[in-house]
């Protein structure tokens, strides 16, 4: 009887060890991560899920020409264009998805990505480390710079960037942007006014309500071409230049796919063409400020 009991106990222990081993193997399998960076685009397409099946949902802030802005078509209907939007369409096409663009204020695009309500954010993002907890960064697809902008009527106030750091001056920047950080860094004594849209900042400068503003260089140059009273006065030092796509942090497969598409589009000149096309459209003779929107008639 004792031998039987001992045999049964030994059997139970063996089975328990096997079960533990099985659990460990299962746990190991569950915790293994796939190497998406080594996959082809076709392989990645099979791995990608999006917030809405069959769609690529992209948040943007369409007040940032030539990155993203509104144009009016022949029927007077507005649509969002720009080289960010051209790249978004390319990504959607390459992945076999329908593109859905959701316009909102700039800081809203970051919040939507952080809450994982969209797949991508494309709003002229710089790879700011403070945003890493809210999104993954793609590789850089466009390298620009930062500028201090004023008007011809205020230009004489500014001999260099340091001269803008004056408590008597009102300096603008977009809410939640790199430019807002640059304003606080370079002009902490000034009255810094953060606004939701770059269009509103430009309108206030033109109306004499603001002495100057920090604006991304390509965007500043686009406005200056269309509004001769604007002056791109100084380059602003910034060591993290370059624009990236913000990717939902739950979607490593999508991040890898976006990087592959960007790499190809940079290599074959596609992005350069997108930038040229967007600059041409945003510099049209019908480019106007209207209701907080940048509108260029096609």
Model-derived features: positions:
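Periplasmic-binding protein-like
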Residues: 62, 143-152, 217, 221-262, ...
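Extracytoplasmic small-molecule ligand-binding "clamshell" domains
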Residues: 28-125
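Ligand-binding clefts/hinges and TM-proximal coupling segments of bilobed small-molecule sensing domains
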Residues: 27, 32-38, 43-49, 178-195, ...
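C-terminal motif of bacterial Sec signal peptides marking the signal peptidase cleavage site
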Residues: 15-19
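Acidic, polar ligand-binding/catalytic clefts
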Residues: 89, 98-163
């Amino acid at each position: 009887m004792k031998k039987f009991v001992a045999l049964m106990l030994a059997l139970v222990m063996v089975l328990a060890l096997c079960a533990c081993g099985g659990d460990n193997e299962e746990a190991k399998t569950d915790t293994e991560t796939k190497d998406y960076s080594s996959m082809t685009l076709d392989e990645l397409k099979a791995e990608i899920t999006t917030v809405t099946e069959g769609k690529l949902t992209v948040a943007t802030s369409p007040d940032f020409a030539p990155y993203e802005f509104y144009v009016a078509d022949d029927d007077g209907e507005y649509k969002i264009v720009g080289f960010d939007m051209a790249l978004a369409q390319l990504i959607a096409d390459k992945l076999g998805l329908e593109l859905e663009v959701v316009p909102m204020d700039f800081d809203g695009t970051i919040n939507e990505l952080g809450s994982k309500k969209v797949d991508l954010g494309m709003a002229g993002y710089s790879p700011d480390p403070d945003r890493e907890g809210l999104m993954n960064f793609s590789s850089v697809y466009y390298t620009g710079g930062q500028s201090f902008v004023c008007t011809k009527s205020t230009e004489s106030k500014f001999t260099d960037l340091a001269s803008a750091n004056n408590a008597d001056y009102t300096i603008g920047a977009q809410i939640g942007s790199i430019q807002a950080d640059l304003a606080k860094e370079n002009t902490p004594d000034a009255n810094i006014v953060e606004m939701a849209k770059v269009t509103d900042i430009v309108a206030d400068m033109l109306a004499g309500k603001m002495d100057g503003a920090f604006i991304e260089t390509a965007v500043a140059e686009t406005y200056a071409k269309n509004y001769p009273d604007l002056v791109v006065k100084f380059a602003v030092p910034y060591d993290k230049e370059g624009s990236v796509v913000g990717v939902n942090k739950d979607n490593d497969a999508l991040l890898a796919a976006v990087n592959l598409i960007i790499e190809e589009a940079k290599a074959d000149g596609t992005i350069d063409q997108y930038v040229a096309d967007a600059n041409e459209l945003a510099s049209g003779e019908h480019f106007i400020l209207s209701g907080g929107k940048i509108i260029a008639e096609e």
